[in-house]
Amino acid sequence: MRLTIVAVGQKVPDWAQTAYDDYAKRFPPELKVELKAVKTEPRGSKTLENLLAAERTRIEGAIARGCRIVALDERGTAVTTMALAEHLKNWQLSGDDVAIVIGGPDGLDAGFKQSAHQRIRLSDLTLPHAMVRVLLIEQLYRAWSITINHPYHRE
């Protein structure tokens, strides 16, 4: 199974990239995790709707055909670590590749969110973009460790 994290925004602080890379390299070959960063649309004089539509086009271009799409959304379904582990297990059993999408500073296009297979939220808090990348990859690693009874996660 291939798990692709599509993130709007290319530049993150070094600490965030280091943390992301540390978790990403822990995944086994049968669960390949890839990060695809897509360019944030410059604001200029564009309406928010046009800006998000342009980012949507880039996001969709980064997602392989046939992928299950999971959008991170502040109004999405709250998930616990155990629920995320269950989702991950089900994704693996389905054999589908999965793309988890992190929106930019203005979020994700409404139509894109509606077309996603799932919408989840990581927290009720507003988090900086770089922190979301790190939090997501850590939680995915934790979820994977739960599915194989690895001692990383403790109840």
From Swiss-Prot:
The keyword S-adenosyl-L-methionine applies. Specifically methylates the pseudouridine at position 1915 (m3Psi1915) in 23S rRNA. Its EC number is 2.1.1.177. Transmembrane segments: none annotated. Homodimer. S-adenosyl-L-methionine binds at residues 72, 103, 122-127. This is Ribosomal RNA large subunit methyltransferase H.
